[in-house]
């Protein structure tokens, strides 16, 4: 299965999900899907960055064939699509590390490059870079691209096969919103002619309304409006200070994107949580502080926009206090475990 979850299912497994658009229920090996409101759905781009993301450093990754339809395959395709934007003339800054990434299509094998910002100190392949850089680079690149530029490039990369699929979808939408029929032969009598003219005029406006509905539904089903980012273990191979810097930059980047963009992070790192709490606290006190410099400031966010949970004994529970900040007991316990060790 796509997320490799099939081995976690048994005869007693129950899965329920409901949104404004769809209801999904899985029980007793039976899957039931109901559309609640098919007219409000807006397509999203989902970008999943797995813990295996370091594979982007592999030479000739574009020649690697992933036969199984897994999240790793989707990640690889998204990476290959996004990296083309950052050529030698459009290098990508990697946080505040004085390093940049660029893609060199002229290279035969090592096409992904890391260069010092001064352009002189070194110019190496991503394959030869540290594991930390190999972990950070896909996060920074894909967040930067799919947060903004992707929406401008979307139609440019539509293949012929995809265009055929879209035409089939357009035909399906036409069947949902059919045009009304009307009598084209107007009667010779004034009263009937007038009546039929009114009917025809009404149909014209109705046709316009139907065309607008068709267009709106087609756009909502085919054109991505927002991106859902899912990052697995952003702390991977990073020193605590680098984890903090990455979290601050990630939140800053999300704030710059389209309204409705969504970020989901899974983590085992207390440093990621501490950094997130700094941004939540900054969001609460931003109107009360001035003339002070905080490294987290560009990542400050509203506590109302954030939910934080942990899985404990198989149950999902919130670890936020009433003010939206991380629970002090939770932070203290995490800190004590590290200090006591």
For each predicted feature, which ranges?
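P-loop NTPase switch/coupling surface
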Residues: 1-119, 217-222, 259-260, 274, ...
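Switch/communication elements of ASCE P-loop NTPase nucleotide-binding domains
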Residues: 115-341
